[in-house]
Amino acid sequence: MTILDDAISLEERARAYYAEAAGRVTDPSGNKILDLLTKEEALHAEALAKMKDGSYGELAGSTLLQNVRGLVEGAVKKGKDAISSDGSLREILQKAMETEAATKRFYEEKAASADDEKVKDLFGKLARQEASHYLLVSSLAEYFDRPAEWVESAEFGLRPEY
């Protein structure tokens, strides 16, 4: 198995996890976010497969952050909670953070040791995209956990803004 096979396998596992998790979540916003992550990981696997068969051109820029930002902002403007209190979502976001951090490390390590410049470049880009996925998922996890941390009351003092 080559380094590209390992990377494809890693992306496919992440894609499968997000797709399965989307099926477990009852919150519509959480479901949409997991669906966006599923699609993003599928694009990564596709780019890696193209690199493997020699037809790779360029990795398209990610629109994940803009799509999720629009989803959350739209929900907030409508006066709705962007993410509900679906208990399974907390567990899913924690696992997603672990997955994204591990995938980012994998790409950074493999980019550093790659001999092929195209592979090195692709792995560097994928590492940056996985880092942005981690930041997104960790921000969502923090947003989701905020209500559990504090009770909204003047007696508890000032809280950081969401």
PLM-predicted stretches and their roles:
Residues M1-Y162:
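Iron-associated oxidoreductase/ferritin-like identity signal
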